[in-house]
């Protein structure tokens, strides 16, 4: 089973890849839908540090999960960008 932090990293990477590669609103919405459907059960599918902070303040995310989630999302965003750079060479 995938760990929730790894799911956040993968989901954010997939979403940022689609955002940087296409910029198409329909593709971004479809990518977000797929990421939420696949990762939501495991991690809650925040895929965005702002959403993570909002979930924390709403009491839906524990204090111990906030920093690892945000770090995973930052790494995932950078990884998605780097993948796009490699594909567009």
Per-range role (PLM):
Residues 1-89:
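Membrane-interface helix-loop junctions and terminal tails of multi-pass membrane proteins
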